[in-house]
């Protein structure tokens, strides 16, 4: 079990088992800093998901700024019509019982 965990740790480069030669050089660390410091703000994936869930910046889930109120109202009206139509029709079996 411990061997398996150590193999996973080595593959993901986590844990304290690194040798001196395997450490990143200081130049490699600084090389990536320039990529992150461009002029625009990079939004994290968590922030993007939160915006989609909560409808951030006034946008709806489809991303076009449309309101879903009309769709909800249509569904509600359709549901009400369906309930009003149920059970008040005469069927062929009703006419046979006379």
UniProtKB/Swiss-Prot annotation:
Write out the entry's keywords from A to Z: Cytoplasm, Metal-binding, Nucleus
What is the protein named? Dehydrin HIRD11
How is this protein organized at the quaternary level?
Interacts with PXL1.
Which residues lie in Basic and acidic residues bias regions? Answer: 19-72
The ranges of region (Disordered) come to 1-98
- Organism this protein belongs to: Arabidopsis thaliana (Mouse-ear cress)
This protein's major location comes to: cytoplasm
MF GO annotations: cobalt ion binding; copper ion binding; mRNA binding; nickel cation binding; zinc ion binding
Q: Name one GO biological process term.
A: negative regulation of hydrogen peroxide biosynthetic process
**Chain's gene name:** HIRD11
Give the UniProt subcellular location, in the record's own words: Cytoplasm; Nucleus
Q: Which GO terms describe its cellular component?
A: cytoplasm; cytosol; nucleus
């Amino acid at each position: 079990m411990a061997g398996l965990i150590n193999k996973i740790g080595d593959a993901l480069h986590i844990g304290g088992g690194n040798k001196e030669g395997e450490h990143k050089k200081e130049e490699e660390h600084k090389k990536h800093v320039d990529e992150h410091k461009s002029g625009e703000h990079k939004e994290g994936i968590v922030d993007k998901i939160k915006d989609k869930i909560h409808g951030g910046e006034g946008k709806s889930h489809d991303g076009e700024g449309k309101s879903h109120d009309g769709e909800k109202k249509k569904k509600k009206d359709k549901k009400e019509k369906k309930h009003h139509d149920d059970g008040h029709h005469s069927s062929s079996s009703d006419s046979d019982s006379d």
